[in-house]
């Protein structure tokens, strides 16, 4: 990541030389473009009963724009202190409230986002956690075979090599 090099540079006591040219900041509102991108993949989910744990994170900025009022939501308010649970759905105790919500509402699927909304994980209608590897394989199959799209499949570094082996014959190029 380069953090080790930065640490060494700081600890070495070398002088920090200011940049010759000052940078600038440009404010951009990309929400509309991002939503348009996401919504082009949304099918008709009206028959699905969805339970959703937004983990008090960044997904709260867009979940209602995509899913509307249909899902049963928990922890939808953005709060960087994450008062309800750590926003890491790979830790099973963080998924317990979603599992309860799925059972209480009779949902077909439970959806949980991590804090910065770059990962989403699922539980089934019986509140069983679905392996992220399985979801990558299913989604990869959908995009490669059903939609005929080509390109990289981005996966977590912890993902099984079996996912890439499954998707490679369909044209999937894995990227960790």
Language-model segments: residues:
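Gly/Ser/Thr-rich loops at beta-strand to alpha-helix junctions
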Residues: 55-60, 117-118, 159-161
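Short acidic, glycine/serine/threonine-rich loops at helix termini
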Residues: 61-65, 84-86, 121-125, 163-169
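Gly/Ser/Thr-enriched, mixed-charge loops and adjacent short helices
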Residues: 1-105
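Residue-level marker for buried hydrophobic side chains located in beta-strands
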Residues: 49-51, 109-113, 153
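Short gly/pro/ser/thr-enriched loop/turn and capping motifs at secondary-structure boundaries
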Residues: 78-82, 119, 137-138, 161
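Glycine-rich phosphate-binding loop
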Residues: 1, 102-124, 129, 172-176
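Proline/glycine-rich low-complexity loops and linkers
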Residues: 4-36, 40, 126-176
